[in-house]
Amino acid sequence: MTDINRIEALERRLAVLEDKDEIRRLRDDYHGCINDGRFDEIVDLFTDDAHVELGYLATYVGRDAIDAGFRGMGTRERFYIKQFIHSHRINVDGDDGTGTSYLEARYGRFGTSYLVSGKYDDICRRVDGRWLFSSMIAVFYYTVPDGVGWTGDELHYLKAK
C-alpha cells in the first residue's frame, strides 16, 4: 500500500468517525430538548419528509405534525419528562445512517410518576451537510407507575416478547 493509499484510507475512516459523532450528537440534541423542555426546537432535527413513531403514544408524519406533536408535550398540564440514553450503535453509508439506542426515562403526569424502558431505532440522512432524523421509531419495553415494579399487576404497559 502506498502512502497515498494509506492517507486516503485514513481519510475515509476519519470521515465515518466524524459522521458517527454527528449522528450521536443529533440523538443527544433531541434528548437535550426533551429534558430541558425545549419542545419547540425538536422539529429542526428532522427532514421535511420525516416520520416519528412513539410506540403506543403517537405517530407523526412530516415536519408540521412533528412540530405540533412535540410542542404539545410542553403544553400538557403537569407533564414532566427526563430521558437517558445508553449504548448508541451507529452505522453510516455515505449520506445515510442508522442508529439504535436504549432508553430509560422518568415521566410524571397529574401526580403519578412512571418508569419507562425502551429503545429508539433511527434512520438519519445528511441534508445540506447536516445530519437529520428521517425516521425515529420508539419501541417501549414497559411503562409502569414508580413503586409498582416493571412486572407488577399494576403496570401501565409491558411489551410482550
Can you name each region flagged by the protein language model?
Residues 1-32, 36, 44:
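Short, low-complexity N-terminal intrinsically disordered segments enriched in polar/charged residues
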Residues 9, 79-87, 106, 140, ...:
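C-terminal-biased regions
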Residues 29-31, 75-78, 111:
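Short helix-to-loop capping/linker segments positioned immediately adjacent to catalytic or ligand/cofactor-binding
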Residues 39-104:
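A solvent-exposed, acidic/Ser-Thr-rich amphipathic alpha-helical stretch
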Residues 83-85, 115-120:
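Short, surface-exposed coil-to-beta transition loops
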Residues 98, 117-150:
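Short beta-strand edge/turn micro-motifs at domain boundaries
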Residues 149-161:
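Extended, polar beta-sheet/loop recognition surfaces of beta-rich domains
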